[in-house]
Amino acid sequence: MLTFVLIHGAWHDGSCWDEVAAHLRNGGHVVHAPTIAGNGRNADRRVDHAVCTKSIVDFFVSQELGGVVLVGHSYGGTIIAKVAEAEPQRLRRLVFFNAFVLNDSQCLFDETPQNVDHTERGARASGDDTFLPPFDMVRDVFFNTVSREDALRFYGNWTPQPIQPFRDKLDLKKFFTLDVPKSYLHATEDIRVPMPER
C-alpha cells in the first residue's frame, strides 16, 4: 500500500483527481488531493508561489504524512519541486505528470512565452490579477480528446487562476541536489505541455 498526494494544475482544485483517487483507493492505496491556496471556488486569490507551496507543506504537516508519492500535474510540477525542498524526508518519490520542471531561477512564464501577453491582459482586466481563458481558447488544447459535451462539463469546474505564481522566479538550487527518486510521465496526447528537449 502506498500513500499518494496528487497536486492539480492551474484553474483546477483537488476534485479534478476524484476518478484517479477512487481508482487508487480501490487498489488499497491512501490518496489525498489537496487544493493549492488561491485555487478552487471562493478562494482568496491574493497569493504568490510561496503561499501556494506553503499550503501544501502545511497539509503534509497537519496530516502527519510520510513515505508519500507526490504527484504534480502541469503547474503542479512547480509546486511539488518546492514542497520537496521543504519536506524531502516525507517523500518516497516525486512524479511529474505532464508537468513543468523549471530550471533554477525560472518562472512558469519562462516556459510558456507564447501565453504571457494574453494571460497578463486577462489578469489586468480581471480586477483581482487572475485569468480564466474562454472555453473556445482552450477547447482544442486542454480537451482535445473528449466530446464537446464533456469538454464543457470539465471547463465548468475551472475557476480563475491567480497569475502571480506564474511570474515568481523560483530558487530551485536545493531541489536539484535532493536524492528523492523522481519519475517523469509524458502523456503523448497532452499537447499543452510539450516535452522539453533536455
Annotate each language-model stretch with its function:
Residues 2-41, 61:
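Conserved HGGG/HGGXW glycine-rich cap/lid loop of the alpha/beta-hydrolase fold
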Residues 30-69, 82-86, 109-114:
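Active-site loop/oxyanion-hole signature of alpha/beta-hydrolase fold enzymes
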Residues 34, 97, 185:
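The conserved SAM/SAH-binding core of class I Rossmann-like methyltransferase domains
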Residues 70-72, 97:
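Short beta-strand immediately N-terminal to the catalytic nucleophile in serine-hydrolase-like folds
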Residues 72, 76, 80:
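Gly/Ala-rich beta-loop-alpha elbow adjacent to hydrolase catalytic centers
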Residues 85, 90-135, 162-166, 170-171, ...:
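Flexible "cap/lid" loop of the alpha/beta hydrolase fold
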Residues 136-145:
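Helix-loop "lid/cap" segments that line or gate small-molecule binding pockets
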